[in-house]
Amino acid sequence: MLDIKFLRTNFEEVKAKLQHRGEDLTDFGRFEELDTRRRELLVQTEELKSKRNEVSQQISVLKREKKDAEALILEMREVGEKVKDLDNELRTVEEDLERLMLSIPNIPHESAPVGETEDDNVVARTWGEVKEFTYEPKPHWDLATDLGILDFERAGKVTGSRFVFYKGAGARLERALISFMLDLHTDEHGYEEVLPPYMVNRASMTGTGQLPKFEEDAFRIESEDYFLIPTAEVPVTNMHRDEILNKEQLPIRYAAFSSCFRSEAGSAGRDTRGLIRQHQFNKVELVKFVKPEDSYEELEKLTNDAERVLQLLELPYRVMSMCTGDLGFTAAKKYDIEVWIPSYGTYREISSCSNFEAFQARRANIRFRREPNGKPEHVHTLNGSGLAIGRTVAAILENYQQEDGTIIIPEVLRPYMGGKTVIK
Protein backbone atom coordinates (compact mmCIF):
# COMPACT_ATOMS: atom_id res chain seq x y z
CA MET A 1 0.00 0.00 0.00
CA LEU A 2 1.21 3.47 -0.82
CA ASP A 3 1.56 6.24 1.76
CA ILE A 4 -1.70 8.19 1.55
CA LYS A 5 0.00 11.46 2.51
CA PHE A 6 2.63 11.00 -0.19
CA LEU A 7 -0.06 10.14 -2.72
CA ARG A 8 -2.09 13.21 -1.73
CA THR A 9 0.80 15.63 -2.20
CA ASN A 10 2.35 13.90 -5.25
CA PHE A 11 -0.73 12.65 -7.06
CA GLU A 12 0.27 13.56 -10.63
CA GLU A 13 3.84 12.29 -10.15
CA VAL A 14 2.58 8.95 -8.80
CA LYS A 15 0.03 8.68 -11.60
CA ALA A 16 2.73 9.23 -14.23
CA LYS A 17 4.96 6.55 -12.67
CA LEU A 18 2.11 4.06 -12.42
CA GLN A 19 1.30 4.62 -16.09
CA HIS A 20 4.71 3.09 -16.85
CA ARG A 21 3.32 -0.15 -15.41
CA GLY A 22 0.62 -0.28 -18.05
CA GLU A 23 -2.03 -0.47 -15.33
CA ASP A 24 -5.67 0.50 -15.87
CA LEU A 25 -5.86 3.70 -13.84
CA THR A 26 -9.60 4.29 -14.34
CA ASP A 27 -10.34 3.92 -10.62
CA PHE A 28 -7.14 5.68 -9.59
CA GLY A 29 -8.68 9.06 -10.43
CA ARG A 30 -11.26 8.52 -7.67
CA PHE A 31 -8.55 8.92 -5.05
CA GLU A 32 -8.70 12.71 -4.99
CA GLU A 33 -12.51 12.66 -4.87
CA LEU A 34 -12.66 10.14 -2.02
CA ASP A 35 -9.77 11.63 -0.08
CA THR A 36 -11.23 15.14 -0.31
CA ARG A 37 -14.69 13.97 0.74
CA ARG A 38 -13.23 11.99 3.65
CA ARG A 39 -11.41 15.03 4.98
CA GLU A 40 -14.53 17.19 4.55
CA LEU A 41 -16.61 14.67 6.48
CA LEU A 42 -14.03 14.48 9.27
CA VAL A 43 -14.13 18.26 9.69
CA GLN A 44 -17.95 18.41 9.58
CA THR A 45 -18.29 15.53 12.01
CA GLU A 46 -15.84 17.03 14.49
CA GLU A 47 -17.57 20.42 14.29
CA LEU A 48 -20.97 18.87 14.97
CA LYS A 49 -19.63 16.72 17.81
CA SER A 50 -18.08 19.81 19.34
CA LYS A 51 -21.41 21.62 19.01
CA ARG A 52 -23.23 18.65 20.54
CA ASN A 53 -20.91 18.79 23.55
CA GLU A 54 -21.52 22.52 23.95
CA VAL A 55 -25.29 22.08 23.77
CA SER A 56 -25.10 19.20 26.25
CA GLN A 57 -23.26 21.44 28.71
CA GLN A 58 -25.86 24.21 28.19
CA ILE A 59 -28.66 21.73 28.86
CA SER A 60 -26.96 20.65 32.09
CA VAL A 61 -26.72 24.27 33.22
CA LEU A 62 -30.40 24.95 32.42
CA LYS A 63 -31.50 21.82 34.27
CA ARG A 64 -29.46 22.75 37.32
CA GLU A 65 -31.12 26.16 37.25
CA LYS A 66 -34.51 24.43 36.76
CA LYS A 67 -35.07 26.29 33.47
CA ASP A 68 -36.73 25.05 30.28
CA ALA A 69 -34.20 23.10 28.17
CA GLU A 70 -36.63 21.50 25.70
CA ALA A 71 -35.52 23.60 22.71
CA LEU A 72 -31.87 22.73 23.30
CA ILE A 73 -32.74 19.06 23.79
CA LEU A 74 -34.46 19.04 20.39
CA GLU A 75 -31.47 20.81 18.87
CA MET A 76 -29.10 18.23 20.35
CA ARG A 77 -31.21 15.40 18.92
CA GLU A 78 -31.05 17.02 15.49
CA VAL A 79 -27.29 17.42 15.82
CA GLY A 80 -27.02 13.80 16.93
CA GLU A 81 -28.92 12.61 13.85
CA LYS A 82 -26.67 14.68 11.60
CA VAL A 83 -23.59 13.22 13.29
CA LYS A 84 -24.99 9.71 12.80
CA ASP A 85 -25.63 10.36 9.11
CA LEU A 86 -22.16 11.85 8.63
CA ASP A 87 -20.53 8.94 10.49
CA ASN A 88 -22.33 6.48 8.20
CA GLU A 89 -21.22 8.37 5.09
CA LEU A 90 -17.69 8.64 6.47
CA ARG A 91 -17.59 4.89 7.09
CA THR A 92 -18.68 4.22 3.50
CA VAL A 93 -16.16 6.68 2.06
CA GLU A 94 -13.33 5.23 4.18
CA GLU A 95 -14.21 1.68 3.09
CA ASP A 96 -14.21 2.79 -0.56
CA LEU A 97 -10.90 4.59 -0.06
CA GLU A 98 -9.38 1.55 1.66
CA ARG A 99 -10.45 -0.72 -1.21
CA LEU A 100 -8.98 1.74 -3.69
CA MET A 101 -5.68 2.02 -1.79
CA LEU A 102 -5.40 -1.78 -1.66
CA SER A 103 -5.85 -1.94 -5.44
CA ILE A 104 -3.08 0.55 -6.31
CA PRO A 105 0.23 -1.15 -7.25
CA ASN A 106 3.65 -0.15 -5.97
CA ILE A 107 5.58 2.71 -7.56
CA PRO A 108 8.43 1.45 -9.77
CA HIS A 109 11.92 2.34 -8.60
CA GLU A 110 13.78 4.80 -10.82
CA SER A 111 16.31 2.10 -11.75
CA ALA A 112 13.63 -0.27 -13.13
CA PRO A 113 13.77 -0.25 -16.96
CA VAL A 114 10.73 1.45 -18.49
CA GLY A 115 8.79 -0.98 -20.68
CA GLU A 116 5.46 -2.65 -21.30
CA THR A 117 6.03 -6.40 -21.64
CA GLU A 118 8.59 -9.12 -20.92
CA ASP A 119 10.22 -8.23 -24.24
CA ASP A 120 11.39 -5.00 -22.59
CA ASN A 121 13.17 -6.73 -19.70
CA VAL A 122 16.92 -6.16 -19.66
CA VAL A 123 19.62 -8.82 -19.30
CA ALA A 124 21.69 -7.80 -16.27
CA ARG A 125 24.20 -10.67 -16.52
CA THR A 126 24.64 -14.26 -17.62
CA TRP A 127 26.57 -17.12 -16.03
CA GLY A 128 27.76 -20.46 -17.33
CA GLU A 129 28.05 -22.03 -20.74
CA VAL A 130 25.02 -23.52 -22.45
CA LYS A 131 25.78 -27.18 -23.23
CA GLU A 132 25.94 -28.15 -26.88
CA PHE A 133 24.38 -31.59 -27.30
CA THR A 134 25.57 -33.98 -30.03
CA TYR A 135 22.11 -35.56 -29.94
CA GLU A 136 18.54 -34.32 -29.56
CA PRO A 137 18.06 -33.63 -25.82
CA LYS A 138 14.90 -35.05 -24.29
CA PRO A 139 12.46 -32.98 -22.22
CA HIS A 140 12.59 -33.67 -18.51
CA TRP A 141 9.13 -35.28 -18.40
CA ASP A 142 10.20 -37.93 -20.90
CA LEU A 143 13.53 -38.52 -19.16
CA ALA A 144 11.88 -38.84 -15.74
CA THR A 145 9.07 -41.07 -16.97
CA ASP A 146 11.54 -43.41 -18.68
CA LEU A 147 13.61 -43.57 -15.48
CA GLY A 148 10.52 -44.13 -13.33
CA ILE A 149 11.32 -41.20 -11.03
CA LEU A 150 8.32 -38.95 -11.83
CA ASP A 151 4.76 -40.13 -12.41
CA PHE A 152 2.45 -37.54 -13.94
CA GLU A 153 -0.14 -40.04 -15.16
CA ARG A 154 -0.96 -41.52 -11.76
CA ALA A 155 -0.96 -38.06 -10.15
CA GLY A 156 -3.51 -37.04 -12.76
CA LYS A 157 -5.64 -40.04 -11.76
CA VAL A 158 -5.32 -39.33 -8.04
CA THR A 159 -5.84 -35.56 -8.24
CA GLY A 160 -5.84 -33.98 -11.70
CA SER A 161 -3.63 -32.15 -14.15
CA ARG A 162 -0.55 -30.21 -12.99
CA PHE A 163 0.31 -32.64 -10.17
CA VAL A 164 3.09 -35.22 -9.93
CA PHE A 165 4.36 -38.15 -7.86
CA TYR A 166 8.12 -38.09 -7.14
CA LYS A 167 9.44 -41.66 -6.79
CA GLY A 168 12.72 -43.30 -5.84
CA ALA A 169 15.71 -41.25 -6.99
CA GLY A 170 13.32 -38.48 -8.05
CA ALA A 171 11.99 -38.09 -4.52
CA ARG A 172 15.50 -38.24 -3.12
CA LEU A 173 16.71 -35.61 -5.62
CA GLU A 174 13.90 -33.27 -4.53
CA ARG A 175 14.78 -33.84 -0.88
CA ALA A 176 18.49 -33.40 -1.60
CA LEU A 177 17.86 -30.03 -3.23
CA ILE A 178 15.75 -28.82 -0.31
CA SER A 179 18.45 -29.75 2.21
CA PHE A 180 21.25 -28.37 0.04
CA MET A 181 19.54 -25.01 -0.43
CA LEU A 182 18.61 -24.63 3.23
CA ASP A 183 22.14 -25.59 4.35
CA LEU A 184 23.66 -23.09 1.93
CA HIS A 185 21.42 -20.20 2.94
CA THR A 186 21.64 -20.82 6.69
CA ASP A 187 25.29 -21.87 7.00
CA GLU A 188 26.89 -19.57 4.43
CA HIS A 189 24.46 -16.73 3.74
CA GLY A 190 23.30 -15.99 7.28
CA TYR A 191 19.57 -16.73 7.09
CA GLU A 192 17.54 -18.20 9.94
CA GLU A 193 15.54 -21.28 8.94
CA VAL A 194 11.76 -21.13 9.32
CA LEU A 195 9.17 -23.84 8.67
CA PRO A 196 5.87 -21.95 8.26
CA PRO A 197 2.18 -22.92 8.26
CA TYR A 198 0.82 -23.87 4.84
CA MET A 199 -2.49 -22.12 5.50
CA VAL A 200 -2.95 -18.43 6.29
CA ASN A 201 -5.86 -16.13 7.00
CA ARG A 202 -7.23 -13.32 4.85
CA ALA A 203 -5.30 -10.61 6.72
CA SER A 204 -2.01 -12.34 5.89
CA MET A 205 -2.83 -12.62 2.18
CA THR A 206 -3.83 -8.95 2.18
CA GLY A 207 -0.66 -7.94 4.01
CA THR A 208 1.66 -9.30 1.33
CA GLY A 209 -0.52 -8.09 -1.55
CA GLN A 210 -2.14 -11.29 -2.87
CA LEU A 211 -5.56 -10.01 -1.79
CA PRO A 212 -7.86 -8.53 -2.78
CA LYS A 213 -6.54 -8.25 -6.34
CA PHE A 214 -5.47 -11.86 -6.98
CA GLU A 215 -7.99 -13.92 -5.02
CA GLU A 216 -8.90 -15.97 -8.10
CA ASP A 217 -5.32 -17.27 -8.21
CA ALA A 218 -5.50 -18.65 -4.67
CA PHE A 219 -6.85 -21.90 -3.23
CA ARG A 220 -9.35 -20.97 -0.51
CA ILE A 221 -10.69 -23.16 2.29
CA GLU A 222 -14.18 -21.70 2.51
CA SER A 223 -15.22 -23.21 5.83
CA GLU A 224 -12.44 -21.33 7.65
CA ASP A 225 -11.70 -18.51 5.17
CA TYR A 226 -8.11 -19.74 5.11
CA PHE A 227 -5.90 -19.84 2.04
CA LEU A 228 -3.28 -22.38 0.98
CA ILE A 229 -0.07 -20.40 0.65
CA PRO A 230 1.09 -19.50 -2.87
CA THR A 231 4.58 -18.95 -1.45
CA ALA A 232 6.27 -18.98 1.97
CA GLU A 233 6.64 -15.22 1.53
CA VAL A 234 3.08 -14.87 2.86
CA PRO A 235 3.36 -16.55 6.29
CA VAL A 236 6.98 -15.53 6.85
CA THR A 237 6.42 -11.84 6.11
CA ASN A 238 3.31 -11.85 8.29
CA MET A 239 5.26 -13.28 11.22
CA HIS A 240 5.97 -9.66 12.10
CA ARG A 241 2.59 -8.18 11.17
CA ASP A 242 1.45 -5.51 13.64
CA GLU A 243 4.86 -5.48 15.33
CA ILE A 244 7.34 -2.72 16.09
CA LEU A 245 10.91 -4.01 15.80
CA ASN A 246 14.06 -2.55 17.28
CA LYS A 247 16.75 -1.14 15.01
CA GLU A 248 19.18 -3.69 16.44
CA GLN A 249 17.02 -6.57 15.14
CA LEU A 250 17.49 -5.47 11.53
CA PRO A 251 18.25 -6.89 9.10
CA ILE A 252 16.17 -10.00 9.71
CA ARG A 253 16.82 -12.75 7.16
CA TYR A 254 14.69 -15.88 6.95
CA ALA A 255 15.00 -18.96 4.73
CA ALA A 256 11.81 -21.00 4.58
CA PHE A 257 10.99 -24.27 2.86
CA SER A 258 7.35 -24.89 2.01
CA SER A 259 5.01 -26.42 -0.47
CA CYS A 260 3.23 -23.77 -2.55
CA PHE A 261 -0.26 -23.90 -4.05
CA ARG A 262 -1.41 -21.93 -7.07
CA SER A 263 -4.50 -22.20 -9.25
CA GLU A 264 -2.63 -20.88 -12.32
CA ALA A 265 -5.95 -19.32 -13.37
CA GLY A 266 -4.36 -17.29 -16.16
CA SER A 267 -2.11 -20.07 -17.48
CA ALA A 268 -4.54 -22.35 -19.31
CA GLY A 269 -2.74 -24.13 -22.12
CA ARG A 270 0.74 -23.01 -21.02
CA ASP A 271 3.41 -25.48 -19.84
CA THR A 272 0.89 -28.29 -19.59
CA ARG A 273 3.59 -30.96 -19.40
CA GLY A 274 6.36 -31.40 -16.87
CA LEU A 275 7.37 -29.54 -13.72
CA ILE A 276 7.47 -25.93 -14.92
CA ARG A 277 3.91 -25.01 -13.93
CA GLN A 278 2.29 -27.11 -11.19
CA HIS A 279 -0.63 -26.48 -8.83
CA GLN A 280 1.53 -27.78 -5.95
CA PHE A 281 5.29 -27.39 -5.85
CA ASN A 282 8.11 -27.00 -3.34
CA LYS A 283 10.24 -23.92 -2.89
CA VAL A 284 12.87 -22.44 -0.60
CA GLU A 285 12.02 -18.78 -0.02
CA LEU A 286 14.28 -15.99 1.23
CA VAL A 287 12.61 -13.12 3.13
CA LYS A 288 14.22 -9.98 4.55
CA PHE A 289 13.16 -7.12 6.83
CA VAL A 290 15.59 -4.20 6.56
CA LYS A 291 16.04 -0.49 7.20
CA PRO A 292 14.86 1.61 4.23
CA GLU A 293 18.33 2.95 3.45
CA ASP A 294 19.71 -0.60 3.17
CA SER A 295 17.05 -2.24 1.02
CA TYR A 296 18.62 -1.91 -2.42
CA GLU A 297 21.98 -3.21 -1.23
CA GLU A 298 20.11 -6.09 0.41
CA LEU A 299 18.27 -6.78 -2.88
CA GLU A 300 21.59 -7.28 -4.65
CA LYS A 301 22.78 -9.60 -1.86
CA LEU A 302 19.57 -11.60 -1.93
CA THR A 303 19.78 -12.03 -5.70
CA ASN A 304 23.41 -13.14 -5.38
CA ASP A 305 22.39 -15.67 -2.70
CA ALA A 306 19.83 -17.20 -5.07
CA GLU A 307 22.34 -17.18 -7.93
CA ARG A 308 24.86 -19.05 -5.79
CA VAL A 309 22.59 -22.10 -5.78
CA LEU A 310 22.74 -22.33 -9.57
CA GLN A 311 26.48 -21.67 -9.62
CA LEU A 312 27.15 -24.56 -7.25
CA LEU A 313 24.84 -26.78 -9.30
CA GLU A 314 26.73 -25.60 -12.40
CA LEU A 315 23.54 -24.71 -14.24
CA PRO A 316 23.73 -21.87 -16.80
CA TYR A 317 21.45 -18.93 -16.09
CA ARG A 318 20.84 -15.26 -16.68
CA VAL A 319 19.55 -12.44 -14.48
CA MET A 320 16.87 -10.17 -15.91
CA SER A 321 16.05 -6.69 -14.62
CA MET A 322 12.30 -6.55 -14.95
CA CYS A 323 10.75 -3.60 -16.75
CA THR A 324 8.02 -1.44 -15.22
CA GLY A 325 5.29 -3.30 -17.12
CA ASP A 326 6.46 -6.71 -15.86
CA LEU A 327 7.20 -5.95 -12.20
CA GLY A 328 4.14 -7.50 -10.68
CA PHE A 329 1.76 -5.73 -8.29
CA THR A 330 3.91 -5.35 -5.18
CA ALA A 331 7.53 -4.88 -6.30
CA ALA A 332 9.34 -1.57 -6.72
CA LYS A 333 12.24 -3.41 -8.36
CA LYS A 334 12.58 -7.05 -9.35
CA TYR A 335 15.16 -9.38 -10.81
CA ASP A 336 14.17 -12.68 -12.39
CA ILE A 337 16.78 -15.43 -12.46
CA GLU A 338 16.22 -17.68 -15.46
CA VAL A 339 17.85 -21.10 -15.85
CA TRP A 340 18.62 -22.70 -19.22
CA ILE A 341 16.18 -25.48 -20.15
CA PRO A 342 17.47 -27.35 -23.25
CA SER A 343 14.11 -28.77 -24.38
CA TYR A 344 12.67 -25.27 -24.53
CA GLY A 345 15.80 -23.89 -26.14
CA THR A 346 15.58 -20.89 -23.84
CA TYR A 347 15.90 -19.64 -20.27
CA ARG A 348 12.96 -20.10 -17.87
CA GLU A 349 12.30 -18.29 -14.61
CA ILE A 350 13.47 -20.14 -11.52
CA SER A 351 13.54 -17.24 -9.04
CA SER A 352 12.11 -13.76 -8.63
CA CYS A 353 13.94 -11.42 -6.24
CA SER A 354 12.01 -8.30 -5.26
CA ASN A 355 12.29 -5.17 -3.16
CA PHE A 356 8.84 -4.06 -2.03
CA GLU A 357 10.18 -1.04 -0.13
CA ALA A 358 7.47 -0.17 2.46
CA PHE A 359 4.56 -1.40 0.31
CA GLN A 360 3.97 -4.66 2.19
CA ALA A 361 5.05 -3.26 5.54
CA ARG A 362 2.41 -0.53 5.28
CA ARG A 363 -0.31 -3.08 4.50
CA ALA A 364 0.86 -5.43 7.27
CA ASN A 365 1.79 -2.67 9.75
CA ILE A 366 5.40 -3.78 10.24
CA ARG A 367 7.52 -1.02 11.75
CA PHE A 368 10.76 -0.36 13.62
CA ARG A 369 12.22 2.29 15.91
CA ARG A 370 15.65 3.79 15.40
CA GLU A 371 15.71 4.94 19.03
CA PRO A 372 13.92 3.47 22.08
CA ASN A 373 11.40 6.32 22.17
CA GLY A 374 11.62 7.24 18.50
CA LYS A 375 8.72 7.47 16.08
CA PRO A 376 8.04 4.10 14.42
CA GLU A 377 8.91 3.83 10.72
CA HIS A 378 7.92 1.15 8.24
CA VAL A 379 10.58 -1.42 7.44
CA HIS A 380 11.37 -2.41 3.86
CA THR A 381 10.62 -6.03 2.96
CA LEU A 382 12.28 -8.16 0.30
CA ASN A 383 11.90 -11.71 -0.87
CA GLY A 384 13.20 -14.11 -3.47
CA SER A 385 13.06 -17.77 -4.38
CA GLY A 386 16.18 -19.57 -3.39
CA LEU A 387 15.07 -21.62 -5.44
CA ALA A 388 11.91 -23.23 -6.85
CA ILE A 389 12.65 -26.93 -6.35
CA GLY A 390 10.63 -28.49 -9.17
CA ARG A 391 12.08 -26.20 -11.80
CA THR A 392 15.55 -26.94 -10.44
CA VAL A 393 14.86 -30.67 -10.83
CA ALA A 394 13.75 -30.03 -14.41
CA ALA A 395 16.93 -28.05 -15.13
CA ILE A 396 19.17 -30.77 -13.65
CA LEU A 397 17.45 -33.58 -15.55
CA GLU A 398 17.75 -31.76 -18.86
CA ASN A 399 21.21 -30.22 -18.51
CA TYR A 400 22.82 -33.33 -16.97
CA GLN A 401 21.17 -35.91 -19.24
CA GLN A 402 23.30 -38.43 -21.11
CA GLU A 403 22.57 -39.90 -24.52
CA ASP A 404 21.47 -43.18 -22.93
CA GLY A 405 18.84 -41.35 -20.82
CA THR A 406 20.73 -41.52 -17.53
CA ILE A 407 21.31 -38.40 -15.43
CA ILE A 408 24.64 -37.32 -13.93
CA ILE A 409 24.05 -36.05 -10.39
CA PRO A 410 25.64 -32.62 -9.79
CA GLU A 411 28.70 -33.04 -7.62
CA VAL A 412 27.45 -30.73 -4.86
CA LEU A 413 24.35 -32.92 -4.40
CA ARG A 414 26.12 -36.26 -4.15
CA PRO A 415 26.57 -36.17 -0.36
CA TYR A 416 22.79 -35.69 -0.10
CA MET A 417 22.19 -38.59 -2.51
CA GLY A 418 24.08 -41.23 -0.54
CA GLY A 419 27.15 -40.83 -2.72
CA LYS A 420 25.33 -41.76 -5.93
CA THR A 421 26.75 -40.20 -9.08
CA VAL A 422 24.17 -41.27 -11.66
CA ILE A 423 20.40 -41.71 -11.81
CA LYS A 424 19.68 -44.71 -14.00
Curated annotation (Swiss-Prot):
It catalyses: tRNA(Ser) + L-serine + ATP = L-seryl-tRNA(Ser) + AMP + diphosphate + H(+); tRNA(Sec) + L-serine + ATP = L-seryl-tRNA(Sec) + AMP + diphosphate + H(+). Gene3D superfamilies: Bira Bifunctional Protein, Domain 2 (3.30.930.10), Serine-tRNA synthetase, tRNA binding domain (1.10.287.40). Pfam families: Seryl_tRNA_N (PF02403), tRNA-synt_2b (PF00587). L-serine binds at residues 231-233, 285, 385. Pathway: Aminoacyl-tRNA biosynthesis; selenocysteinyl-tRNA(Sec) biosynthesis; L-seryl-tRNA(Sec) from L-serine and tRNA(Sec): step 1/1. The gene is serS. Its main location: cytoplasm. Homodimer. The tRNA molecule binds across the dimer. It comes from Bacillus cereus (strain ATCC 14579 / DSM 31 / CCUG 7414 / JCM 2152 / NBRC 15305 / NCIMB 9373 / NCTC 2599 / NRRL B-3711). Belongs to the class-II aminoacyl-tRNA synthetase family. Type-1 seryl-tRNA synthetase subfamily. Keywords: Aminoacyl-tRNA synthetase, ATP-binding, Cytoplasm, Ligase, Nucleotide-binding, Protein biosynthesis. GO terms for biological process: selenocysteine biosynthetic process; seryl-tRNA aminoacylation. GO terms for molecular function: ATP binding; catalytic activity, acting on a protein; serine-tRNA ligase activity; transferase activity. Consists of two distinct domains, a catalytic core and a N-terminal extension that is involved in tRNA binding. InterPro entries: aa-tRNA-synt_IIb, aa-tRNA-synth_II, aa-tRNA-synth_II/BPL/LPL, Ser-tRNA-ligase_type_1, Ser-tRNA-synth_1_N, SerRS_1_N_sf, SerRS_core, tRNA-bd_arm. This is Serine--tRNA ligase. GO terms for cellular component: cytoplasm.
